[in-house]
Amino acid sequence: MERTFIAIKPDGVQRGLVGTIIQRLESRGYQLVGLKLVQVSQELAEAHYAEHKERPFFHSLVKFITSGPVVAMVWQGKGVIAAARKLIGKTNPLEAEPGTIRGDFGIDIGRNLIHGSDGVETAQREIALWFDESELVSWTPVAQSWIYE
């Protein structure tokens, strides 16, 4: 089963959107297998955003993600990476469609509430970076037979 990493950034936590965001993913039928509230270290932030290290906005990304608590999550399900990206919406909330998390709750590209892995390899790297395998729970929701054939 496919897995993805999703993080509710400090602005989403401070604005009280954690429950709303989790509910949207659960309502789609995706399964939460890992969750923790983290005060992100400088080291973790720099590793997470390593691909942007040479970009002019790298330091502002690191500063923001370390500015408050982050809810780190691992979700699993059929096509979860693409579906979660669609549910999250475009990076710039002003361009995100209504009905997406960023379209409904975001205003500023620098405060866009949530991060989601953009592909299988990225998801694997981010999950390994943020979670130890022992922190991920293998379980079967009773509703699973009503969601998947």
From Swiss-Prot:
Pathway: Purine metabolism. CDD domains: NDPk_I. It is an enzyme of class 2 (transferase). GO terms for cellular component: cytoplasm. It comes from the Bacteria. Coiled coil: none annotated. SUPFAM superfamilies: Nucleoside diphosphate kinase, NDK. ATP binds at residues 9, 57, 85, 91, 102, 112. GO terms for molecular function: ATP binding; metal ion binding; nucleoside diphosphate kinase activity. Its cofactor is Mg(2+). It is found in: Cytoplasm. Gene3D superfamilies: Nucleoside diphosphate kinase-like domain. The active site is at residue 115. Its main location: cytoplasm. Its EC number is 2.7.4.6. GO terms for biological process: CTP biosynthetic process; GTP biosynthetic process; UTP biosynthetic process. Keywords: ATP-binding, Cytoplasm, Kinase, Magnesium, Metal-binding, Nucleotide metabolism, Nucleotide-binding, Phosphoprotein, Transferase. Major role in the synthesis of nucleoside triphosphates other than ATP. The ATP gamma phosphate is transferred to the NDP beta phosphate via a ping-pong mechanism, using a phosphorylated active-site intermediate. Belongs to the NDK family. NCBIfam families: PRK00668.1. HAMAP family: NDP_kinase (MF_00451). Homotetramer. This is Nucleoside diphosphate kinase.
